[in-house]
Amino acid sequence: MVVSHEVDDRGLAELRRPRNDLVSEVAVGRDRFTLDHGPFHSWERTLQVDGGRDGTHRVVETITYRTAVAVWRPLFALPLRWAVRARRVPWWAPPDRLDARATRVLCLLACVQVVDGYLGTVITQTITFASDEFGRGDAAQGVTLAVVRLGIVVALGVVALADRRGRRRLLVATALAAVAATALGALSPGLWFLGSTQLLARGLTMGVGILIGVFAAEELPRGSRAYGVSVLALCAALGAGMAVWVLPVADLDPRGWRAVYVVPVVAIPGLVAVGRRLPESLRYTANIGSEQAVLNGNIGGRRKVEGYRLLMLAVASFLLLVFAAPASQFQNDFLKDHRGYSAAGITLFTLLTTTPAASGSSWLAGGPTPVADGVWGPSACWAARCSWWSATTPREPLCGPQQWLARRWAR
C-alpha cells in the first residue's frame, strides 16, 4: 500500500514516529520500520521524503504487510486496509492488540466453530421432515430429541481426555468424528437410527464447542476473551445458518432432508488443514509437568470462588435451556404442521428472527460490561418472563411480520 502525504515539519515528525495503534512498530533506520507486535506475520513501513521550499514536505509512505487471519483474509482485506491507512485502532478490533499467534489461533478456531455450529443444528431443523418420512408423530420426536440430549455424557468424556491428551489433537479428531457420525444419519432406515447417530454426533459436537472455548480462553489476553467468545459465537451462528440455508432441499423430495446431513463432509479437508496449522494451547503446554506444583499450592480459596462461579453459570444455563431447548426443537414442526410453512418458508422465518438476535448478543458479549454480571437475578427473571410469555401469549402477535414475510416470499 502506497500513501502520499503533504505535511509540515510537525506532520513529518509524526510520520517518523513508530506506530502504536493496530500495530506496534520498531525503527530499524531513519525512515524504515518493522513489526514489533500486532496481528501480522510480517510488516514493513518505509518513508521517502522530498523537502519543499515553503516548509512543506511530500512524503511517500509504503507499507507492506501479511496478515495472520488465515482463510478469513478476503473478509478482512478492505477493513484492514482502511485501518492501516487511518493509523488508528478500528472499532471492530479487540480491546487488546493481538499478536500473530493469537490472531491465527482465533481464526482457525473460528473455522472449526462454523462446522460445529452446523453440526449442532441439523437434528432440530430436520426431525420434523424425518418424522414425516418414517410416519412418526410428535411423541416420537420428543423421545428422540430427549435421547439425543444424553450425548452430554460423550461431551464430558471428550473434555476429560483433553486434559490428558492435549487440546489440538483431540479437537480435530473429535470434529472429524462428529462429521462422520452426522453423515451416517443420512442412511437412517428409521427414527431410532437417526436418534442413535445423533446421540453420538451431538455429544461430539458439544465436546468440540467446549474445547474451542477452552482453547480460546487459554490463548487470548485476559481483556479480549469476551471479544473472542463473541467472534466464535458469530461463527457458530453462521454455521447454524448454513444448515438452515440447505433446508429448502426438503421441499424437493420426502427424502431430501438427508442432504443436510451429507453437506458437512465437504468440511473434512478443511478440518485436516486446520489440524496441521493449529498449535497446541500455550497453557496446556506450560502446565505439562507442573501438576504437582499446583496441587501443592495453597489454592483452596481460589477453588471455592471458582466453584461458586461455576454454579452460577450452570444455574443460568439451566434456566435458559428449560425454555430455549423445547422452543428450538419443536419450532419447525409447529411452523410446518400448524402454520403450513414449506421448508423454504421455515428457512426465511428462521433467518429473519435469529440473525438480529445473534448479532446483538455477540455485540453485548464483546462490550465493556461483562454479560455475566448479576447472573442470578437477571437469569431467573428472564427465564421466568420467557416461560410466562410462551405459555400465555399467542405466537402470531410476537412474530407476525416475520411470519407474513416468510409465507409471502417462500411459497
Where are these regions (language model features)?
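Helix-to-loop junctions at the C-terminal end of transmembrane segments
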Residues: V154-R167, G360-A372
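Glycine-rich segments within core transmembrane alpha-helices of 12-TM secondary carriers
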Residues: S224-L252, A267
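Helix-breaking motifs and short loop linkers at transmembrane-helix boundaries and internal kinks
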Residues: G135, G166, L187-F193, L204, ...
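Structural signature of the two symmetry-related core transmembrane helices
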Residues: R169-L184, G374-W389
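Extracytoplasmic gate region of multi-pass secondary transporters
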Residues: T121-T128, E306-A358
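Cytoplasmic helix-loop-helix junction between adjacent transmembrane helices
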Residues: T197-L234
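Symmetry-related core transmembrane helices of the 12-TM Major Facilitator Superfamily/SLC fold
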Residues: W257-R276
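Paired small-residue
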Residues: A181, W192-A201, P397-L405
